């Protein structure tokens, strides 16, 4: 499945005729043999619908820690579902006896705290994927939190020394709601926040198709693992500066934030050919960030392809990922239903109180979760069906196809006898047919790719049988075949059941 998913992503890129070969010289990834990397691929594009709120000041990280699902501070541990307590051993050791990062949360632009890794907590100047919930524990929006600016050097050093500063990424339409939320939660926190409008957002990925699935993926040993050893601001700044200036030396001072996609980490650990996705935020005067891409940072030849935002959305849908509030109806979904518990440092179960924490903590503690988000593909999606789905004001139901030969009679439910005798609305002994529960609901789609919230009870008949169940949805007079795809996290989830 993982090989198929990777191949599907790469096949999407082959529809472009504007491939440009780039010959690389100086090695940035020194452990890779160039002879195995004849067809490396850089795919990039601008993402137009993103906006940013800048938050800065000495109380910034404490303020954000009370609003997002990620653990941004090491100083609180949860004793049970309803209490928190200040840790006496803060900044000393984590629960696995690993050294904890050293930083002053109120002074200096030190980056962002990552609570979990194989080497314990660490500091980074790369953004993290997180979420904002409402008071009932439902998702308002996901977000990327970027330490800003991306690069620390002589030109930005004076700014860096003042206090923490972050850019928070949102879809444009939800910015007014987030500004209102920030204002209501500000209280006495020493922070300032405002919308930053003069920005551009870019997605790109780099893959090494010349490798085999069984080869080690270069991004693991050259980026993921080294990141987890960064325990102070100086080390994380040095790593970020080296990485960013190696890739984009001409515009490094115009990069306001840099995000390394970590939600695909399981895939990269199992597939040497899997692409690594990135997102960068630049100032608006950058016409094309990838004209400044430094091909000499790698020891092999690239194909360079430009794609639109729909392409990158489809890539994320194939992985089963959200990318902004435009994909959902806000206040309708729980973060664990969206598999945020399988993403690095996205949801913490031991950070203490934050908005929406009670339901999330209770769900995590009890393990009772009836639905999860999975990727799907449509088999026969017509233009009319696309139009109707885009106009739909609720999540369309997905039903399981039942073979008429094996179909069981629908169960009947008796109504309670009426104490008033016969009713003009029907006999008291009328039998009512129970409505079958939908197998799932369609959350978002683009082209033939989508994400759907499926009932967990169907997983066995989808993924663990030689003859998987068939599914469909009906919109208007259109019946659309729906094929569930295996999510990246499925094996880990299955082993935990």
From Swiss-Prot:
Biased composition annotated in UniProt, kind: Polar residues:
412-428
Q: Tell me yes or no: is Transit peptide among this UniProt entry's keywords.
A: yes
GO cellular component, alphabetical, reads: mitochondrial matrix
The record's section on InterPro entries has: YgfZ/GcvT, YgfZ/GcvT_CS
For molecular function, the Gene Ontology terms on record are: transferase activity
Region Disordered, annotated ranges = 88-107, 404-428
As for subcellular location, the record says: Mitochondrion matrix
Among the GO biological process terms of this entry, one is:
protein maturation
Provide the alphabetized UniProt keywords. Mitochondrion, Transit peptide
State if Secreted is listed as a keyword. no
Q: What is its main location?
A: mitochondrion
* Transit peptide (first-last residue): 1-36
**Where would one find the signal peptide in this protein?**
none
What's the family? Belongs to the GcvT family. CAF17/IBA57 subfamily.
Q: What is this protein called?
A: Iron-sulfur cluster assembly factor IBA57 homolog, mitochondrial
Organism of this sequence:
Candida glabrata (strain ATCC 2001 / BCRC 20586 / JCM 3761 / NBRC 0622 / NRRL Y-65 / CBS 138) (Yeast)
């Amino acid at each position: 499945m993982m090989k198929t998913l990777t191949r599907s992503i790469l096949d999407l890129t082959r529809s472009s005729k504007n491939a440009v070969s780039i010959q690389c010289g100086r090695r940035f990834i020194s452990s890779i043999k160039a002879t195995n990397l004849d067809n490396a691929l850089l795919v990039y594009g601008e993402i137009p619908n993103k906006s940013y709120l800048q938050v800065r000041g000495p109380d910034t990280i404490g303020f954000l820690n009370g609003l997002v699902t990620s653990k941004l501070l090491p100083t609180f541990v949860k004793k049970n579902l309803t209490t928190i307590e200040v840790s006496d051993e803060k900044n000393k050791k984590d629960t696995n006896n690993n050294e904890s990062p050293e930083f002053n949360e109120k002074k200096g632009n030190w980056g962002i705290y990552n609570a979990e890794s194989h080497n314990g907590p660490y500091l980074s100047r790369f953004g993290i994927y997180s979420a904002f919930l409402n008071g009932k524990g439902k998702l308002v929006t996901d977000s990327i939190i970027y330490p800003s600016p991306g690069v620390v050097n002589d030109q930005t050093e004076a700014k860096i020394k003042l206090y923490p500063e972050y850019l928070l990424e949102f879809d444009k339409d939800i910015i007014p709601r987030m500004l209102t939320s920030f204002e209501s939660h500000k209280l006495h926190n020493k922070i300032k926040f405002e919308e930053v409008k003069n920005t551009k957002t870019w997605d790109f990925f780099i893959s090494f198709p010349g490798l085999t699935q069984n080869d080690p993926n270069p991004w693991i040993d050259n980026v993921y693992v080294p990141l987890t050893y960064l325990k102070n601001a100086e080390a994380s700044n040095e790593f970020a500066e080296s990485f960013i200036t190696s890739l984009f030396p001409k515009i490094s001072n115009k990069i306001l934030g840099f995000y390394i996609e970590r939600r695909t980490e399981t895939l990269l650990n199992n597939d040497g050919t899997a692409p690594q996705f990135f997102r960068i935020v630049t100032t608006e005067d950058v016409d094309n960030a990838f004209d400044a891409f430094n091909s000499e940072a790698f020891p092999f030849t690239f194909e360079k392809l430009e794609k639109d935002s729909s392409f990158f959305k489809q890539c994320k849908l194939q992985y089963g990922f959200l990318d902004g509030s435009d994909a959902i109806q806000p206040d309708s979904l729980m973060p664990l239903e969206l598999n945020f518990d399988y993403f690095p440092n996205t949801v913490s179960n031991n950070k203490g109180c934050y908005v929406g924490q009670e339901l999330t903590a209770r769900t995590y503690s009890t393990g009772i979760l009836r639905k999860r988000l999975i990727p799907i593909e449509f088999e026969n999606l017509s233009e009319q069906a696309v139009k109707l789905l885009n106009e739909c004001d609720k999540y369309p139901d997905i039903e399981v196809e039942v073979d008429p030969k094996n179909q069981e009679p629908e169960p009947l439910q008796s109504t309670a006898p009426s104490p008033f005798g016969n009713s003009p609305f029907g006999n008291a002994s009328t039998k009512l047919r129970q409505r079958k529960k939908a197998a799932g609901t369609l959350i978002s789609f683009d082209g033939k790719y989508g994400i759907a919230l499926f009932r967990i009870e169907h997983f066995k008949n989808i993924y663990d049988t030689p003859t998987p169940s068939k599914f469909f949805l009906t919109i208007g007079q259109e019946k659309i075949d729906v094929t569930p795809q295996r999510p990246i996290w499925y094996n880990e989830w299955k082993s935990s059941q």
